[in-house]
Amino acid sequence: MKRYILIGIYSLIISFWGITHAQVLYRISGNSAVAPSYILATNRMMDMSFIDTIPNAFKCYAACNKVITEFAIQDYEAIGALRQAALLPDSVQLRNFYTNEQYLEIDQALRINLNMGLDKLGRMKPSYLAEMYRNELMKRWLNYDEDRSMETFFEKVALQSNIPVYGLDDVGETMYMIFDREPFHWQCEELLKVVEYPEKEVRFERSIREMYQYGRLTDMAYFVKAPDNQTSLSYSDYQVFAKRNKEWVKRLTPHLREGKAFITLNAIYLGGEDGLLAQLKAEGFRIKAVNK
């Protein structure tokens, strides 16, 4: 009996160590860089308090003089453009892409979760509606709090400290990634799928969050592109991310050669053979986990 208790305690220790020392922070050097830079893999479902468990995260941030992220949130004109881009053209009617039963099903789901139906939201693109609906699911089932998400923590700190923040994507690219990276009929199917099978979306995000807590970035990439992943974030999205990573390497290279860049990006973009870390390594940069 004593032996089993000791084994149980040991397993708990290993589990705790794995979570609190997840490999999500990396040092980037070499390839003519005059000083190291750092890249932090983030997960929007994680509370900002998780950063306290990442060894040397604040020390590495303090050693940098700029923050680089996917899209700079301080660009208010860009945010206005994004809101406009979320609207359907006047010539497109969402009702025409669904049966009456499907349209009513979506309308009812939106009313229950967003307190608004398609009478008010029917001019929005289906990709935007699907994301709004998913966010409400995550708030309800995974305690997602956008204001406390670790995803934008360092960006906000930098802005408060007058440290420059650079976005890897411009406004047009960001609008494409959010609203138009998939054909319109796919977006319509995706919205219906999210409404009909919300539990799949929640299970997916829960699994991704758990992998992130253990620093399993490669597993996260494989999980997204797996053939049996039928959620709103799947293989077609992974292909878009992989292609974009190649462009990001070009845009990051000047910053990395200058050094002292603190990069924060969604962990899904980083792992796997097509992930940003592998592509930076292929470009000649040295990548090393900070907490090893």
What are these regions (language model features)?
Residues 9, 49, 273:
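Active-site-proximal flexible loops/turns
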